[in-house]
From Swiss-Prot:
Reactions catalysed according to its record: a D-alpha-amino acid + A + H2O = a 2-oxocarboxylate + AH2 + NH4(+)
Residues noted as binding FAD in the record, renumbered to the chain: 3-17
Family membership: Belongs to the DadA oxidoreductase family.
Top-rank taxon, per record: Bacteria
Keywords noted in UniProt: FAD, Flavoprotein, Oxidoreductase
Organism annotation: Azotobacter vinelandii (strain DJ / ATCC BAA-1303)
InterPro entries: DadA, FAD-dep_OxRdtase, FAD/NAD-bd_sf
Cited SUPFAM superfamilies: FAD-linked reductases, C-terminal domain, FAD/NAD(P)-binding domain
NCBIfam families with a match to the protein in the record: PRK00711.1 (NF001933)
Pathway info: Amino-acid degradation; D-alanine degradation; NH(3) and pyruvate from D-alanine: step 1/1
One annotated Gene Ontology cellular component of this protein: cytoplasm
Protein name from the UniProt record: D-amino acid dehydrogenase
Function summary: Oxidative deamination of D-amino acids.
EC number, UniProt record: 1.4.99.-
């Protein structure tokens, strides 16, 4: 069976790899000139299943109002003329109840934990090198109020069987020695020892090479225009004016996925959540992070690669604007300068932005559609790197009619309604 995968970010590439392993003939199409050149290019670098949480949470509406007036707020809303922005916000607000938060977080943690296990297996099988570290993630709380509020997340971790450790100031200095000088300004920390780090762009590039070795064909520099349908089937993809056909199709185009789905009558509530990062050369390894640090106040992650520090975070609802906001750079520099003032050379930092494809409930969309041969793997928000391997393998199993290793409940697009356009009465074809 021939599969056309649209998108060569970390999601599309992992999907292609697992499909090829399952015996499918796979072609990947992307407008970029290489894998992982957009959202996957310079993300925060963390593989953090335990911190898989939706932005839609109790208390967020009030916090968002307060953040409107803060210079270094983690969330910013830039009103546009796009009605989809306001619809997405309304849907997000409906998910800010305690019950919805717990349900959404369970789905996200389930997929993220599985994805971490898939990454471990992939690394053991292939020896893929992406500057990965398996040294955990530490979430820093600057106030006692933040530490107390973490109780609801800790409860979910406990129910999900995720190991964790609460750290006092001495414990923070033990796991992250470079923070010893600032530990007295922190209230405490939550450490997840099983979390990991790694360069997502490097991983995707090298996985694409492994996929090519399995027969996957990558076609770069080609723009996907629209999907063509006939009844309940997709009959082809219009690419640079020509029609490309396959037996099965996978849409993994991140924030751009809804544009292709809307003409098919599929409403995918995905909106771009703009994020920023700095990549900083390390000048003193002893004063740099050991693994990943999450600053709860600013919602910023600081991650250690071999010779670089990656500082990433922020969330802007600003449509598809890819301009670099200097105020966001100030925030990233503020956080890393406060916690690791001697670790890297900020004067040589590279500033970047990308559009994360966010759903209003935080859970990605992985699975079938009402079209018998169209599948989705998109909407991973800030957790594309964390969820990539698990999402790719899960979808490949579903398409091959192989029993998945985890439950796929609540992950496909049918959770957004029972209308005809979102029903999932599909019959995926098996691999030869």
């Amino acid at each position: 069976m021939r599969v056309l995968v649209l998108g060569s970010g970390v999601i599309g590439t992992t999907t292609a790899y697992y499909l090829a392993r399952a015996g499918f003939e796979v072609v990947v199409v992307d407008r970029a000139e290489a894998p992982a050149m957009e959202t996957s290019f310079a993300n925060a670098g963390q593989v953090s299943p335990g911190y898989a949480s939706p932005w839609a949470a109790p208390g967020v509406p009030l916090k968002a109002l307060k953040w409107l007036f803060e210079r270094h707020a983690p969330l910013a809303i830039r009103p546009t003329a796009d009605w989809r922005q306001y619809l997405w916000l309304a849907q997000m607000l409906r998910n800010c109840t305690a019950g919805r938060y717990a349900l959404n977080k369970e789905r996200m943690v389930r997929l993220s934990e599985y994805s971490r296990d898939c990454l471990d297996e992939l690394r053991a099988e292939t020896g893929i090198d992406y500057e990965g570290r398996q040294l955990g993630t530490t979430q820093l709380f600057r106030t006692q109020r933040q530490l107390d509020a973490a109780g609801k997340d800790i409860a979910v971790l406990a129910r999900s069987g995720v190991p964790y450790e609460l750290l006092d100031r001495a414990g923070i200095a033990r796991v992250e020695p470079a923070l010893a000088g600032v530990a007295d300004r922190l209230a405490g920390a939550l450490r997840l020892p099983n979390d990991q780090t790694g360069d997502c762009h490097l991983f995707t590039t090298r996985l694409a090479e492994l996929a090519a070795g399995l027969g996957v064909e990558f076609r770069f520099g080609q723009s996907v225009e629209r999907l063509e349908r006939d009844g309940e089937r997709i009959v082809g993809v219009r690419i640079d004016g020509r029609l490309e056909s396959a037996d099965l199709y996978v849409l993994a185009l991140g924030s751009y996925s809804p544009r292709l789905l809307a003409p098919l009558g599929i409403r995918a509530p995905i909106y771009p959540l703009k994020g920023y990062s700095l990549t900083i050369p390390i000048v003193d390894p002893a004063m740099a992070p050991t693994s990943t640090i999450l600053d709860e106040t600013y919602k910023v992650a600081i991650t250690r690669f071999e010779t670089r520090i990656r500082v990433g975070g922020m969330a802007e609802l600003a449509g598809f604007d890819l301009s670099l906001n200097p105020r966001r750079r100030e925030t990233l520099e503020l956080v890393v300068g406060d916690l690791y003032p001697r670790g890297g050379d900020l004067a040589r930092a590279e500033f970047w932005t990308g559009l994360r494809p966010a759903t209003p409930d935080g859970t990605p969309i992985v699975g079938a559609t009402r079209y018998r041969n169209l599948f989705l793997n998109t909407g991973h928000g800030t957790l594309g790197w964390t969820m990539a391997c698990g999402s790719g393998r899960l979808l490949a199993d579903l398409m091959a009619r192989t029993r998945p290793q985890i439950s796929a409940a609540g992950l496909d697009i049918s959770r957004y309604g029972n209308s005809q356009e979102n029903s999932t009465h599909v019959h995926p074809a098996p691999a030869n």
